Structure formats: structure tokens, C-alpha cells
Swiss-Prot record:
Cofactor: how and how many bound: Binds 1 Mg(2+) ion per subunit.
Domain of life: Bacteria
Ligand binding (GTP): 12-18, 40-42, 307, 333-335, 415-417
Subunit structure: Homodimer.
PANTHER family, sorted: ADENYLOSUCCINATE SYNTHETASE
Cell compartment(s), UniProt: Cytoplasm
Catalytic activity, reaction form: IMP + L-aspartate + GTP = N(6)-(1,2-dicarboxyethyl)-AMP + GDP + phosphate + 2 H(+)
Annotated protein name in UniProt: Adenylosuccinate synthetase
Species annotation: Agrobacterium fabrum (strain C58 / ATCC 33970) (Agrobacterium tumefaciens (strain C58))
Pfam families hit by this protein: Adenylsucc_synt (PF00709)
Residues binding Mg(2+), per UniProt: D13, G40
Residues binding substrate: T301, V302, T303, G304, R305, K306, R307
Active site: D13 (proton acceptor), H41 (proton donor)
Coiled coil (UniProt feature): none
Amino acid sequence: MTNVVVVGSQWGDEGKGKIVDWLSERADVVVRYQGGHNAGHTLVIDGISYKLSLLPSGVVRPGKLAVIGNGVVVDPHALIAEIGRLEVQGVKVTPENLRIADNATLILSLHRELDGMREDAASNSGTKIGTTRRGIGPAYEDKVGRRAIRVMDLADMEALSAKVDRILTHHNALRRGFGATEVSHETIMEELGSIAERILPFSETVWLLLDKKRRAGARILFEGAQGSLLDIDHGTYPYVTSSNTVAGQAAAGSGMGPGSLGYILGITKAYTTRVGEGPFPTELHDEIGQFLGEKGHEFGTVTGRKRRCGWFDAALVRQSVATNGITGIALTKLDVLDGLDELKICVGYKLDGQEIDHLPASQGAQARVEPIYVTLEGWKESTVGARKWADLPAQAIKYVRQVEELIGAPVALLSTSPERDDTILVTDPFED
């Protein structure tokens, strides 16, 4: 038995929700370790759809413990609203099934406002990143700047007052630069006071809790948000998120040592998508790109934004396999490729006349690369609902084997529809 870390191996939206749902049924504890409420997924259980963006997936299953780790930035208002939506659907979220790290950073209204002001200013200059304007980046900045308000701070309003002064010194200077009204001390104190009683009952020393669970033999599932190519260090900077999204963050963002992480499962879409700005070497602007977007229902769970679509980029996923230490992948949305006459896979790039096998880190170089493709024959038969290899067309199997060879990692699971049972299991990550 081992613990499992789920990471996205592309730019997010790889279909983690279904795979995490499938795994969470067998886990005892499900842990979110990075990000905020800027990335979401939909779980379908007994025909009911649950849309989650901040809460770990385990919260919708009876008897599971959901944990929000210290690596997450928590918008208390968004959390309370999400809990409320689940309660309307009959899911009770209590301190019995949800614990939040007492040292997790809080997202405040001033973070959301700063995020929006920056995006507006960047839009005018043509340099916008395309954030969700939810305050994620500014909250992480305050965390690194050692002026953040954390969950534990809500328990001591007297000490909190000085911390609010400190954060306002920074933010009001920025607001003056944008020509915005300054925020008063009273406004932030009232904001925090209004949610303290709702948030504090969930507060926990999470590293200690997880250590006890591990020693007791619990199966722990670490649930990543977004994708590895959005990692602040290893992604397509500056068009990235504000946290580390690679598997190593599961240790730092939860307080468990890296030796306890276990199987690293990379969720990998059979083609490539991206939301927002940034380089995308295999992007398709033709009818095939439109076909993938429409058939794959490529719209964001949280934002509703249309995703850009392109061919599978093995060079990028190969990088993710290396930077995450991926043990095996879950290949999703293979069925979306049904009916195409031919398929292309990017195996490397040309940069200034030279062939290279990885995407360079330089923003300028990323804009100049041209994909090098191999072409495979497509298939006309349907793969929808396939639950064993024998159900797949020969050309689909050939495509999967080519992906495995090019990225240097085996397929552990193969998803053939949004339904959780339409999955071909090759290797059980929890039993590896």
C-alpha cells in the first residue's frame, strides 16, 4: 500500500476530477496542497454533479477526511460559499470531515482588488497574464513577503490588529500607485471578524494530523490543482500560476516528508489545451482545433473560458514526467480523438534552425519554436466506454503505446468517457 499524488502534466484541465474521484473512493484522507479557488473540477457521483474549486474531492464522500494544506491560499468567503452550495446538495461539511491548516494564508478582499487592478493595467499595455482575478497571486506575494494573515491569526484579534497594519502599509502604497482609494484598518478587521467563527472550527495543525494518519496506515491522496506547466518555476513563465504545482509541492504544501508521497500519477490529456495567455507550440487554429474544443467540451469549470486546443505535445509531457518524478500517467479523453483521419504528436522543436528536445525557459525562445511532428493513422471506431484493451481499435492502442514511448512513462489508467467506470486500469496506484 502506498500514498498517491495526483498532478496535471500539462496546462491544467487534464481531467483530474474524474481520476481523483475514482481514487478518493479508496483513500482515507484527501489533501489539497497548493493553489486556491482559481482552478475547479466537477465530480459526478450517483448522477449528481458537484463543482469544487477549493474543497478537496474527498469532502463529498462519507467517511473520508478532507484536508486543506498550508500550501493553499484560502479565500474564506469563497470557502463558506462552496460549503453552502454543497449543503444544498445534501453534503454536510463539518470539522469532522474537513480540516484546514492553521498556517494557511488567507485571501482578503484587497488581494482580489489588486489582482483586478493589475490585470486592467496590463490589458491596456498588452502584457496581461490572464489571471482569474481571484487574488491568488497577491496572496502568495504577501505570504512570501511575510506579511500574510493566516488562519491561526483569526483566533487572536488583538494581535491581528498589528498584522493588519503591516499588510495595509504595503497594499495602500500599491493602491495609491493605481489611483485607487486606500483601505481602512477597520474595513479589514471587520472583514476578518465576520468570518472568524466560521473558519476557526476547521483549523488544525495539519502536518501533525497527517503524520498520525500515516503512522496509522491511512491511505492518503494528494490532490493537485492546475498543471505542471503552470508551475511558477517549471512552467511557461510569466504565464504561470503563483505557486509550485509539481509533485514535490505535495510535501511542502502539506507538511509531510517527500519520502511519504509514494506513487506520482500524472493526469495527461490525449491532446493539449490551454486557457488564457502564453506560448502553445502545437495550438491549432483550424477546423481540427475547433473539433477538439467542441467534442471535448473545452470550457473552464470555474471561469467558463474557452480553452485553446492543439495536438499532443510529448516534449512538454516528457518534461513534466521528469520534473514531477511521475511514476505513471492517467491518459484521459482518448475518445475525443475518435473519427480523425490522422493524428499528430509533437516530439520536439526547431529553434532558430536547430532541433531541440525540450521547450526552452526563455520567453523569447518559446515564442520562436516550431513543433516537430510524427503523424499516426487515426481510427473511425468509437472508444467511448471502453473498459478493457480488447475494446479499443488497433490504431488507438498504437497511439497510446507511442505516447508511452515518447514521454518515458507507462499508462496506469486510461479514461474513455467522463463516466467514472469507463476506465481501463493497468496499474493500481495505491497498490504499486
